[in-house]
């Protein structure tokens, strides 16, 4: 994802009749001037935009048999693999609402904002393949329809096309408007965030085995438990 999307310069556009990706009836007319790139043009949202583009590319490729074959995902499990990618993304987006500050109206983590944008794209353009449901107990549930992955694909495809298009053709203002809308958090989402915070789990503690050299020059592995005292003793 990070390595994709050509940056159009003057020589790529002027006189080349490059068909506009979003409007095939016209040609591309915008490009980056010499010495100007994506980062400085898109400013403060550039990193988040790029993380979103990379994650969106990864999900898009999870729909492609050619990509899954490379990683030896069996044909009978490829649909489940793709479904797991969608479930992981929407679950992470919900949990990562923690990184949005209602006080400053800013995200503290680019990856978190990027995943939230993907989640909103699935809700907006996924043809009901992904739904956010509030039940009678005031709980929020994310529902993904395993029989409508085509809807997820169309949403991811639309998002990726727009992200690549605005970046490649230096459509700076349109790109910013498009992306800022996806990462914006209104009062409805603040309520979802508040609920997500009640489900926030404690940070995990991971403790690996310890390799020690014995007096006779050999090595042995000490298996340790994950209780605090044992970790400190190691």
Give short role names for the model-derived ranges.
Residues 1-3, 56:
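Catalytic glutamate of the conserved HExxH
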Residues 3-50:
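Post-HEXXH active-site segment of zinc metalloproteases
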Residues 37-52, 56-166:
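Long, well-structured alpha-helical subdomains associated
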Residues 132-234:
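Non-catalytic terminal regions of proteins
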Residues 16, 25, 105, 138, ...:
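Intrinsic-disorder/low-complexity loop/linker signature
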